[in-house]
């Protein structure tokens, strides 16, 4: 299945953050993309981070011609959990542009998990609740086979104006089962140029754990829950080695909640 991944955080629309010149690639988005690609789906990425309008997605919709648009926000980035109204509206605009072309749309974010009716009202076909890699796998497999999706756990959808909520699934415990994020989908040079011009060094983001037992209201617990799960040291080192060999950052941000 051809799946176009995107997310709804536009750094230029957040003037305070854009002025810092410290954009990080959408880690959660490219993690999900890598997982679906590993399972045999054809994936592409429309990265919104460095642009200022959702209208540019039209080019990717026309050139890639996806069967499914997945707006999959980066749950590792705390900025995406303080959803700004303009970012939400940008997501709605992307949904509308995809639906205009007859493309099905799934959305995964902390905001859509909390406000799923707003996203369904905007035209989304599916809202994926919480941590969504396994949910998205089952959804994509069913869509590819034209099978019924109502039995897929972790989805909210509408059937004849009636909202159907299949309930949340438990979070993943074995994080080593996930591949290294699809860093090849990122225009690394564009990020490097901004970092070096604004800060004099180049930083990339990584996550080694998911979940946190504490109760801060800004973290990723709406997505990854309050059970603490970690990658093995070997799995983490493999990603560090990949990034150092291929992209040569001089700094890493470990964006774990704890």
What residue spans do the PLM features occupy?
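Extreme N-terminal starter segment of soluble prokaryotic enzymes
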Residues: 1-4
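N-terminal [4Fe-4S]-dependent radical SAM core
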Residues: 9-18, 49, 83, 158-205
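Glycine-rich beta-alpha loop elements in corrinoid/cobalamin-binding modules
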Residues: 28, 32-39, 44-172
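Radical SAM [4Fe-4S] cluster-binding motif and immediate context
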Residues: 24, 176, 181-258
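Short beta-strands and strand-loop turn motifs
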Residues: 15, 70-76, 219, 252-255
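Short, solvent-exposed loop/turn segments at secondary-structure boundaries
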Residues: 17-18, 81-85, 227-231
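Glycine- and acidic-residue-enriched helix-capping/strand-helix junction motifs
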Residues: 14-29
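Flexible loop residues that form catalytic
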Residues: 8-11, 74, 132, 160, ...
